[in-house]
C-alpha cells in the first residue's frame, strides 16, 4: 500500500522469488511439533497475500488437509472474487485497518476506505477476525476515529476482536537511508495514557480486545 507510517519501506522495491506449495509445506512439516505444542500454524502475510489468490487458496487448502491452522494478514484491498476464493480455507483473518474515517485513511494510504470497509464486512460475517488498528495521534486516535471504529466493529455479526497497535517511529531511519521524506516525521508516538484510554473506550463499548491487550 505504501502507508505513510510503514516501518519497512525497504521492502517496497519489486523483486521476486518463486516457491511452490510443496516447498512451503515441506518446511512447515519440519516444525510440526512446535506448531502442535504452541497452537500455532500458517499465517500468510505480505505485501498483500490476496494479490495471488490462486496460489494462496491452494496453499491454504493443502495446509488444512494436513491439519495446520491457517490465517491470512490482509489490508483488505482486494477484489471480492479473490477474497471468496480464499476464505473457505482460512481459520482466522488478521485484518489491518489503517484508519476508520475516509479522510484519515486517504491521507495515510492514498486508498479508499469504502472498498476496505465492504471487504471487512464480507469477511467478518464469515470468518473470525482480529482487527489490527494502528493508533496514530492526530490521525486515528481522535474521538471521531474512535466512534467510527466502534460503529464498524458493531456492524460485524461474527467473531471479532480488536488489537490496538500503538504507532511508533522506528522506521524513520529506514526512510532516511533510502533518501525519502518520512510523511509523519513530526507525529509523536501515543502516550501510555492515550493507549490505555483508547483501549478502555473499546471495552466500554462492548468490544473484545485481542489477548495481547488484556
Predicted regions and their residues:
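Catalytic cores of large soluble enzymes that bind and process phosphate-bearing ligands
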Residues: 16, 141, 190
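Canonical Radical SAM [4Fe-4S] cluster-binding loop centered on the CxxxCxxC motif
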Residues: 1-19
Amino acid at each position: 500500500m505504501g502507508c505513510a507510517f510503514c516501518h519497512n519501506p525497504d521492502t517496497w522495491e519489486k523483486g521476486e522469488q518463486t516457491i511452490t506449495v510443496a516447498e512451503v509445506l515441506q518446511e512447515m512439516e519440519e516444525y510440526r511439533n512446535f506448531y502442535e505444542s504452541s497452537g500455532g500454524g500458517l499465517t500468510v502475510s505480505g505485501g498483500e497475500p490476496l494479490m495471488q489468490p490462486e496460489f494462496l487458496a491452494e496453499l491454504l487448502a493443502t495446509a488444512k488437509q494436513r491439519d495446520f491452522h491457517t490465517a491470512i494478514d490482509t489490508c483488505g484491498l482486494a477484489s471480492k472474487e479473490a477474497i471468496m476464493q480464499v476464505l473457505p480455507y482460512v481459520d482466522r483473518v488478521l485484518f489491518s485497518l489503517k484508519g476508520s474515517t475516509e479522510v484519515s485513511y486517504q491521507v495515510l494510504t492514498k486508498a479508499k476506505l469504502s472498498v476496505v470497509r465492504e471487504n471487512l464486512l464480507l469477511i467478518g460475517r464469515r470468518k473470525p477476525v482480529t482487527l489490527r488498528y494502528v493508533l496514530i495521534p492526530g490521525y486515528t486516535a481522535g474521538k471521531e476515529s474512535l466512534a467510527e471504529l466502534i460503529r464498524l466493529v458493531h456492524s460485524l455479526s461474527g467473531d471479532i476482536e480488536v488489537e490496538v497497535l500503538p504507532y511508533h517511529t522506528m522506521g524513520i531511519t529506514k526512510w532516511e537511508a533510502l533518501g525519502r521524506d518520512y510523511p509523519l516525521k513530526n507525529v509523536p508516538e501515543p502516550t501510555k495514557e492515550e493507549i490505555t484510554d483508547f483501549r478502555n473506550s473499546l471495552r466500554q463499548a462492548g468490544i473484545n480486545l485481542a489477548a495481547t491487550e488484556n
